[in-house]
UniProtKB/Swiss-Prot annotation:
Function: Hydrolyzes indole-3-acetyl-aspartate (IAA-Asp) to indole-3-acetic acid (IAA). Shows an exclusively high substrate specificity for IAA-Asp.
Organism: Enterobacter agglomerans (Erwinia herbicola)
Matches recorded under NCBIfam families: amidohydrolases (TIGR01891)
The gene coding this protein: iaaspH
Keywords: Hydrolase
The protein, known as: Indole-3-acetyl-aspartic acid hydrolase
EC number: 3.5.1.134
Entry similarity comment: Belongs to the peptidase M20 family.
Length: 436
């Protein structure tokens, strides 16, 4: 059997090919039909037990789900783009989650590794300096691009699946590989948590590449994610002739505008950082019509769950107050959510020990003082910890061609080998008799 590092280096060209295929056929949240089908096919061929679709994703817990027409069109596109049929049907309707399980048959705990699969709603750059365009693997799906590295994450998950099967005789306990849909907008993890996919997990690790961490650095316990609530506010008023009978109208546009201004005046919290943002406002049908409908797309964030809850509750008060001022009604619809991150110190220490063994890792650290957004893997972390398990979130530094969520985003694909080796060592070196 080859040495682990040698085997992974031999696997890297294939991982790169997988990554570039996924990049070319980018699919955004809840429509990762081709992506999930390709992943499931390969995991099945490796001999993993698979939990798919509705068994891995709770229907009622999905957030920010596209409409039925969008889902149907994306499903048909995936079929036309080569999604393997035996697997494609399992994901129809927006149930694009996968859990691959390797039961060694030997005593030991359950370890889980989570990667995300979705792309962003973004048009990829077509400049000749952009490597994916230059080398002909830029996204062929309009308005969808892997601009955050999730194509790399998925390839890392598949690479890890290959390695664990190759070295299965050295493993103990149960290994679960979680391929999550719809991380962007923090929409997908809650539905997989509700389906119970991490309820039996003793040790949990989620990963990301890049995020401003320099190449050669591995962060083993990222703890700077903010709790967040993402929601739509739908205002309903009464349409009327703006010149003839304006008093008969109830102006939903003005209610939404009042709310948008007032939301940004919510007082900060003394216990830590908070954020609120109105990213979209849509209203009106014509200049001579009192608008009867309006939409705000809003998000709140907090350094802790309590701070985010404070901001969200104040936001709800502001929105309902603005609606009342103009005689309108308003409905709030939850579109995404995540909690703050609190990695388990003992697990972070163990992960740091494994990362430090990997060639190409110059420093393995517990945390890094840098601002972060939000990440719904924190919901999986929290559930594992609620069940007395340990959890953490790792970031593998790499050189980026542009920042995350930018149309020129790309990364150094060598980071995938570093990530796979670190995660493989995490399973292979686990002290199963005493735990961490």
């Amino acid at each position: 059997m080859p040495l682990l590092n040698e085997y992974i280096r031999q696997l890297l060209p294939e991982m790169t090919q997988w990554r570039r295929d996924l990049h070319h056929y980018a699919e955004s949240g809840w429509v990762e039909f081709r992506t999930a089908s390709k992943v499931a096919e390969q995991l099945h061929q490796l001999g993993y037990d698979l939990t798919l679709g509705r068994d891995a994703v709770d229907a009622d817990s999905r957030m920010g789900l596209p409409d039925e027409i969008t889902l149907a069109n994306a499903f048909q596109r995936a079929r036309e783009q080569g999604a393997p049929e035996p697997w494609l049907s399992a994901f129809e309707g927006g149930f694009t989650g996968i859990v691959a399980t390797l039961d060694t048959g030997r005593p030991g705990p359950t370890l889980a590794f989570r990667v995300d699969m979705d792309a962003l709603d973004l048009n990829e750059d077509t400049d000749g300096h952009h490597r994916p365009f230059r080398e002909d693997f830029a996204s062929c799906n309009p308005g969808m691009m892997h601009a955050c590295g999730h194509d790399g994450h998925t390839a890392i998950g598949l690479g890890l699946a290959h390695v664990l099967k190759q070295y299965a005789d050295r493993l103990h306990g149960v290994i679960k590989l979680i391929f999550q849909p719809a991380e962007e907008g923090t929409r997908g993890a809650r539905a997989m948590v509700a389906a119970g996919v991490v309820d039996d997990v003793d040790y949990f690790t989620a990963i990301h590449i890049g995020t401003g961490v320099p190449a050669g650095t591995v962060v083993c316990g990222s703890d700077n994610f903010m709790a967040t609530t993402k929601f739509d506010a739908l205002f309903t008023g009464v349409a009327a002739h703006a010149g003839g009978k304006p008093e008969d109208g109830r102006n939903a546009l003005l209610a939404a505008a009042q709310a948008a201004i007032a939301l940004h005046a919510i007082a900060p919290h003394s216990a830590g950082a908070s954020r609120v943002n109105v990213g979209v406002m849509q209203a009106g049908t014509g200049r001579n019509v009192v608008p009867s409908g309006a939409l705000l797309k809003v998000e709140t964030r907090g350094e802790t769950e309590d701070i985010n809850r404070y901001v969200f509750e104040r936001a709800r008060e502001v929105i309902h107050g603005a609606a009342a001022m103009y005689g309108a009604s308003v409905e709030l619809r939850l579109m995404g959510a995540a909690t703050s991150s609190a990695p388990s110190p003992g697990w972070v220490h163990y992960l740091r020990e494994q990362a430090a063994r990997v060639p190409g890792v110059e420093q393995a650290i517990d945390r890094i003082a840098a601002p972060a957004g939000s990440e719904d893997a924190t919901l999986m972390m929290a559930r594992v910890q609620q069940h007395n398990g340990l959890a953490s979130y790792m970031v593998f530094g790499t050189e980026l061609s542009a920042g995350h969520h930018n149309e020129q985003f790309d990364f150094d694909e060598n980071v995938m080998a570093i990530a796979v080796e670190t995660l493989a060592l995490t399973a292979l070196n686990f002290p199963w008799q005493r735990g961490v």
